[in-house]
Amino acid sequence: MADKIKAAGGIVIRGKKILFIKKNGRWEFPKGRLKKRANKKKTALREISEETGLKKKDLEIIQPLIPTHNHNKANGNISIKETTWFLVKFTGDPSFKLKPEKREGISKCKWVTLNKLEITLKNSRPLVHYLLGFVLNDPGYKDYLKNQRK
């Protein structure tokens, strides 16, 4: 029987930029496991804050996104990770210096403009492409973009 792991994460936006973390050599979005009886929204905000240094008070959940499921096999054990994703807006100072959580294998954090996404996505898993495609075509995100300058 497979172990079931629940996680939550966020696709963080600031103007027309999206936040990525480089974890174990690949670009992805911040996420982490739910602790027992933990709230998914609070977990997503906590993980974003821990992995990037952004303050939770400067993060605002806009809407939930689709969940994803990953199947992993290690040492003969199968695990299924279900991640609940949220679209999150960064409302803090744009000049805030991101602080990657090195102990988690995160070597870098960066804001990527929409026109530079292709370069970043060259070194990311298909799941990241899938989530990004979903977000970029989401009506809520398109409405958000209409009110942004850069």
Regions found by a protein language model. Name each.
Residues 1-30:
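N-terminal strand-loop-strand
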Residues 8-13, 37-38, 149:
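Short acidic/polar alpha-helix capping motifs at helix-coil junctions
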Residues 26-28, 35-36, 126-127:
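Short, surface-exposed beta-strand-loop junctions and turns on beta-sheet-rich folds
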Residues 28, 62, 66, 77, ...:
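Residue-level signal for alpha-helical context at structural boundaries
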Residues 34-124:
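Unchanged
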Residues 119-150:
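Charged phosphate-binding loop/patch that engages nucleotide di/tri-phosphates or the phosphate backbone
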